[in-house]
Amino acid sequence: MILAVDVGNTNIVFGGFDNNGELRFISRLNTQVSRMEDQYAIKLKDILSLYGFENAAITGLNIKIDDPSVLGSDLVCGGVAAKSKYPTPCIFIDVGTCLKIFALDRSGAMLGGAIAPGPRLSFEALSGKTASLPLIGAEPVGKMIGTNSPDSMRAGVIGGIACMIDGMIERYEEELGEKATIVATGGYASLIAPLCRRELIVDPDLVLEGLHIIYKKNQKK
């Protein structure tokens, strides 16, 4: 399938063509500046699913969660790239607005994962829901025992996420029954990885590479 996209100020129009050049479907989505990239990706995945283009057929990824249709496209792409590039079982971690920790089993199937607030959401919650804590940005943590509010917040958020990742890896491997390759991506991955006690492979382009792998796979059909 070839997906043609016409992005306008009011609507985004999607057209799906089969390999014979026949237009299979047209779908429209309201253009909203406030939507994040992931939200558009989810909407697009829903549209493709509506017209019979399922994840397994498009991506080659065996998704074993309760409802594969609700898995975010960023996680699908990350799973595809992790399966292609690294030994399995594999735990891939996306440290962005949300912290997403997902697992592939030895066969490369997506088992599921965990979702928690990432650095940005955590800092916004601390500032927005308390009377005196400032809104700060994510910066490297020098020491875990902070001596002022910003340093203590960074130690709690950045250092705390690193500790969460270490703990979740340990528990995931208990459920998997073996050690796993650990891959981290997302905007904050390079900031978090040095604080983790487990070695993380930082792969900032994992999701984009997954998109490319999916494109090449479908180009062959």
Question: Locations of the language-model features?
Answer:
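Glycine-rich phosphate-binding/hydrolytic loop that grips phosphoryl groups
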Residues: 76, 131, 163, 200-221
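Short hydrophobic/aromatic-enriched beta-strand-loop microsegments
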Residues: 24-25, 54, 110-115, 200-208
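Phosphate-binding/catalytic loop of phosphoryl-transfer enzymes
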Residues: 18, 60-130, 159-168, 200
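A short, N-terminal amphipathic alpha-helix
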Residues: 38-53, 168-175, 214
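Short glycine-rich phosphate-binding loop at a beta-alpha junction
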Residues: 46-58, 178-187
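Short glycine-aspartate micro-motif
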Residues: 2-6, 90-94, 183
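Adenine-nucleotide phosphate-binding core of ATP-dependent small-molecule kinases
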Residues: 141-178, 199-200
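Short glycine-rich, Thr/Ser-proximal phosphate-binding strand/loop in the N-terminal lobe
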Residues: 2-42, 107-134, 139
